[in-house]
Every structure is written in C-alpha cells, then in structure tokens.
Amino acid sequence: MNRRNFIALTAGAAAAGYGIGYFLPKTHADELFLRPPGAVKNFESLCIKCGQCVQVCPYHSIGLLDIAQGYSNGTSYIDAHERGCYLCDLFPCVLACPSGALDHATTQISDVKMGVGVLREHEACLAYKNENVNLSGVTRMLERKIYNDREQAVKDAVQNSVDKPCDLCVSLCPVGDAAISMAKSDGRNLPEFKQGCVGCGVCAEVCPAQIIDIAPNRSYDEIYKG
C-alpha cells in the first residue's frame, strides 16, 4: 500500500467521523460503545443488565457502563484500549446471555460484527518508524492483574515483544491475516485493516503507541469504502 492509497483510506475514515477524536456524541448509544460479540441491533432494549456476560468472560474484557452513560447505565460494553475481546471458542458471553441481547446464533468468528479497526496517527506507529517495542509502552499491559492461563499467554506474548520490531496488533489478532496484516507504505511497514476485521479490539489494547481505535457497530465498507 503506497502513501497515496493510505491517505485515501484514512481520509475516508475521517469523512465518516472515525479519524482522530472520532468518538463524538451520537444519538444512539450502540454507536458509541463497543458491545460484546453477538450484540443484536436492539441490544439496548434487550440487555437486562444482569452481568452474566461479565462474569463468564475469561479475559475480563467486558464491563458494565456506569451512571455517566445515562440510559446505557448497567449495559455491558468493552473498552478495547483496556482489554479487547479475544473471540473465545463457543463464546461463553453469548451462551450466558439470558435475554437475547447477545444472539445465540453467534457460534463462529465469521458471525461476529462488533465494528472495525481504525489506525490514526500512522506516523506514530512503531512499525512505521522502524522502532522496537519499548518496555514503557507496554508496562500498563504487563502490570495488569492475571487471573488465568489465557491472560498469562497474552502477557507473555507482550513481554516477549520488548526490544523487538513491533507487530503486536498483527500477531495477537484472534482473527489473523483476514483482519489485519503488515503492508508497505513508502517502503515501511504499516498495519492494514482488511474485510475480515470484526472489531474485537485486541489491536487497540496491545498497541504500544495507543493509535488504534475501534469504530463500534460499523463495517469495513462503511469506514474504508463509504
């Protein structure tokens, strides 16, 4: 991907409101918050705020919105910069949902449509700058409390990336090359989102530069081709 094509892609994202600071107030909460996998269109009205999805998530990715979010108070969401969704086998969060807010027909990754990743400030990307991962950039992840082997595996992968060329967004993506891969821009590496991105948010979590966001409830075509 050359610089002209990259600028065209990011310009399209910015035009759709997903450039720097894309989290602007919207009229509908589902456009603001990243929901767990399988969230249905009318999630807001179906979620009974029971917290079952929160309890069963092995990565502790899901939280409940607080009073600051108004009518969304108590509904489940994912803060991708804190902890993305690792798209577990069998989707325990979906199976635990008693109200239908998370669609039980969600049984495989291809069923998931949480959103799509957006790279902003590409010139700050460590891969683009040809810089290694610095310990200070991943300290927040390494200091996270670990509760199980799955979380430990993520921590180990992050720890092993220190002082090496950065590709964490690509190497830890639970979808794989169909969602994100390293492309060339001006002869330098740069992560490129693809049609297979489901908006899980792992890339946003593990990015040392914190320059990846997730556009919730949006498709690849809406952001990059709209």
Feature roles, as predicted:
Residues M1-L190, K194-G226:
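Non-ligating segments of multi-cofactor redox enzymes
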